[in-house]
Every structure is written in structure tokens, then in C-alpha cells.
UniProtKB/Swiss-Prot annotation:
Pfam families: Oxidored_q4. This is NADH-ubiquinone oxidoreductase chain 3. It catalyses: a ubiquinone + NADH + 5 H(+)(in) = a ubiquinol + NAD(+) + 4 H(+)(out). Keywords: Electron transport, Membrane, Mitochondrion, Mitochondrion inner membrane, NAD, Respiratory chain, Translocase, Transmembrane, Transmembrane helix, Transport, Ubiquinone. It is a multi-pass membrane protein. The chain crosses the membrane at residues 4-24, 55-75, 87-107. GO terms for molecular function: NADH dehydrogenase (ubiquinone) activity. It is an enzyme of class 7 (translocase). GO terms for cellular component: mitochondrial inner membrane; NADH dehydrogenase complex. Belongs to the complex I subunit 3 family. It comes from Osgoodomys banderanus. Core subunit of respiratory chain NADH dehydrogenase (Complex I) which is composed of 45 different subunits. Interacts with TMEM186. Interacts with TMEM242. Its EC number is 7.1.1.2.
């Protein structure tokens, strides 16, 4: 019975919050709120604006390093090593490889905004 009460209270509460979130913004409607947010771009202009290639390259580099850190850094702890020295050595090697990649990008001027 307690499980049923908790479930029904959660359903009623979430339904009320959804309805409030749906109807409350419609009470105070103005032009800026009705327009979609376009990440700093003017939504009335053309969609074919030129895109900065330097920004694109820095963004791709950030995504690559971010994914490498997110996916590879937990690896030494995930493979259940018994020796802490081996685990720390593996983590140090992974971070060193990432640091070398970052240094290579820096030397190749891949992180600079100037043309």
C-alpha cells in the first residue's frame, strides 16, 4: 500500500508540475519569448552564413580530447588491477599521450584564432 501511495503522489505531483510549466509561460507572452533562440545568430537573416573554419577546428579538437578523457581516463580503474602502481602508471601513460597530443596541436598552431 505504501508503494501505491508513493507512486500515486509522484504521478500527481509530476502531472501538476508539467501542467504548470506548460500554462504558466503562456500567461506572460511577448515577442522575444515567442521567438526561438538561435545561439546568438539573428534568426531573420539567411541560414547560409559563412562559418569560421578556425572555430570549427578548435571545436573538433575539443571534442576529440573531451571524448578521449571521458572514455579512456577511467580505464585503469575499470580493469580492476590489484597493484596501485600499475594502475597509476597506466593512468599516467594515458594522460601523457593526451598531453603530447595537445602539445602537438599547440606547436602546429591548431589552437590559435588568428588567421
Amino acid at each position: 500500500m505504501n508503494m501505491f501511495m508513493a507512486l500515486s503522489v509522484n504521478i500527481i505531483l509530476s502531472t501538476c508540475l508539467i501542467l504548470i510549466a506548460f500554462w504558466l509561460p503562456q500567461l506572460n507572452l511577448y515577442n522575444e519569448k515567442a521567438n526561438p533562440y538561435e545561439c546568438g545568430f539573428d534568426q531573420s537573416s539567411t541560414a547560409r552564413l559563412p562559418f569560421s573554419m578556425k572555430f570549427f577546428l578548435v571545436a573538433i579538437t575539443f571534442l576529440l580530447f573531451d571524448l578521449e578523457i571521458a572514455l579512456l581516463l577511467p580505464l585503469p580503474w575499470a580493469i580492476q588491477m590489484y597493484s596501485i602502481n600499475t594502475m597509476m602508471l597506466t593512468a599516467f601513460i594515458l594522460v601523457s599521450i593526451l598531453a603530447l597530443g595537445l602539445a602537438y596541436e599547440w606547436v602546429q598552431k591548431g589552437l590559435e584564432w588568428t588567421e
